[in-house]
């Protein structure tokens, strides 16, 4: 957990309007996004929350714990990944927005990296750029 927090600190150095929460990092219980967002919203009820995910994750979002509650708690920002079908993404977008989710899909630069890739690079002292 401390490695993930350190990676975030490095990635966000000099960036304003970002804050790191360790709610999930040091918990002994399984972490669920709906629980984490509940805690964040309770502690900071006037803040807006944005959940950045790979667009491929939209497909599986309905399977997440307490999905219908979760989609009311934040705005999702879906980032396309190379090799992922835009048609599948559009179908997933249509499904989750019909269910009530707010999803931003913009012209973000494609990012061919996952959290698994970042952890591997960090643990092996490899350079992570941009």
Language-model features, listed with the residues they occupy:
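Nucleotidyltransferase catalytic core that binds NTPs
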Residues: 1-130
């Amino acid at each position: 957990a401390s490695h993930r927090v350190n990676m975030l600190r490095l990635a966000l150095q000099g960036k304003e309007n970002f804050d790191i929460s360790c709610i999930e990092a040091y918990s002994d219980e399984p972490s669920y996004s709906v629980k984490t967002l509940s805690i964040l919203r309770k502690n900071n009820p006037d803040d807006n929350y944005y959940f950045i995910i790979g667009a491929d994750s939209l497909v599986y979002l309905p399977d997440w714990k307490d999905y219908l509650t979760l989609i009311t708690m934040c705005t999702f920002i879906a980032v396309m990944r190379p090799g992922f079908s835009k048609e599948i993404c559009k179908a997933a977008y249509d499904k989750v927005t019909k269910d009530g989710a707010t999803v931003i899909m913009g012209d973000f630069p494609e990012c061919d990296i996952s959290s698994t890739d970042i952890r591997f690079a960090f643990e092996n002292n490899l350079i992570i750029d941009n």
